[in-house]
Amino acid sequence: ARERSGDAVGAGKALLKAAELAPNYSEVRWTLGNYLLRQGREEEAFKEISKAVETDTRYANPAVVLAWQVYDGDLNMIAQKIGDSTAIKAQLSPFLVKQKRFDEAFNFWNSIPDEEKKTTYRKNGEDFYNQLIEAKSFRNALTVQSQIAKPEDEKFAVGTLFNPDFEQNVKPANASVFDWKLGGGIQPQISLDASQKHAGTRSLILLYNSSDGK
């Protein structure tokens, strides 16, 4: 409030005092870091921002975005200024895919311990996967999906047709990009039939019942 009213010096003193009284309060560190950055005190600013990320990983994503803007995508400088913690790496991976820097995205992602990919940073992995799908980097997306998959999840593999015999149910909605999908429209009619089969327990039936051939 003081800074907005023109008292930047008073605002700085108040924030420094707050950080002194509550050194582990991440919101104070984050606010102080942004204040220092606006004052052109870059070195001090990112020390505070880094401390905010250390105590609250929710600040990792905005810290990455901010550092990216300040250092124009220089990853060495970004890591130097906000650190290379696992939380930062997990945020950098999907962010870098948006910048089409796939190799660097995977370098950061693959440095995260395998178990943490499935647990602590699974949500980041899902974001990473979705960004790769959007970028049409399907092989890489499949790699990430296998890394974050739960034991009960479907298992997809490169060069392998999933559910080729339709012994598993076809999802009517929310199917993976690597799974079978039912398209819109009324033709053909698609169903699974246990009475007509060549192997297994059932076959896929396609019924064309259109008077105009469409």
Model-derived features with residue positions:
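Alpha-solenoid helical repeat scaffolds
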Residues: A1, K13, S26-L32, F46-K47, ...
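Structural motif corresponding to the intra-repeat A-B loop/turn of tetratricopeptide repeats
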Residues: R2-S5, Q39, Q99, A135
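Structural signature of tandem alpha-helical TPR/SEL1-like repeats
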Residues: R4-K17, Q39-E48, V70-I78
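A structural motif in tetratricopeptide-repeat
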Residues: S5, L15, A22, D56-T57, ...
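Repeat-solenoid scaffold signature
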Residues: A19-T55, Y121, Y129-L132
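Extracellular and organelle-lumenal recognition/adhesion modules and their flexible linkers in secreted
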Residues: R58, P62, G83-K214
